[in-house]
């Protein structure tokens, strides 16, 4: 596996490749990330991964400085997955000049749910993904359903900019107790880690209620948030939405495919999760 930081060297290395499969990450790789690499290999060859902790998607009071950086361990894991190239640019490599041009997602999708609680987050995500796509020029790119809203925004962005890249959705990988794998799980204290699966448990309760015929979505959302709050969580949202556009389902949407999404803080750690219904 070649580890490359230069955009020009990356393009030279990939010249002539027309089936490249790309997996962008921020590093601190776990089994969820590695499952993306395996899925990428099913859809293209060679597989290119990137590691870049993108300052643009972190708010002023978020965890950019303490976000876990484990490059040596990440390289070993990617080598075992037979990744062809790891693109690991520095901030100066990727942003040699101030990034004056930004990609703004549409308000209807970018300013709800995560966008409401993390202003500017999706602008930062779209900008770096667009830049990484320009560098790698992949045939396919793999994103996890764990970040459901991000997946939808990136897919729409690629469609509307006519990028020649198909976005492949990967299923969420969970620990044996149901907790969705995340690099931020390492922030959890021991007692918090034992409590953390309750987020997925509440999502399952909401999903079961909807599948049993409950159509008062606000009632089940509020009940789930109250249950978490009673256990010491600080929920930002638990929301049943249409998979197609992440808007609330109305009476006319009886046959719409749904997803329930959640974000909540447990101690100092903010966790997100979702389940398709």
Curated annotation (Swiss-Prot):
Pfam families: Pantoate_ligase
Annotated ATP binding sites: 26-33, 144-147, 173, 181-184
Residues annotated as catalytic: 33 (proton donor)
Residues bound to beta-alanine: 57
GO molecular function: ATP binding; pantoate-beta-alanine ligase activity
SUPFAM superfamilies, per database record: Nucleotidylyl transferase
Superkingdom of the source species: Bacteria
CDD domains: PanC
Keyword entries, A-Z: ATP-binding, Cytoplasm, Ligase, Nucleotide-binding, Pantothenate biosynthesis
Miscellaneous information on this protein: The reaction proceeds by a bi uni uni bi ping pong mechanism.
Role of this protein: Catalyzes the condensation of pantoate with beta-alanine in an ATP-dependent reaction via a pantoyl-adenylate intermediate.
Quaternary structure and interacting proteins, as annotated: Homodimer.
Protein name per Swiss-Prot or TrEMBL: Pantothenate synthetase
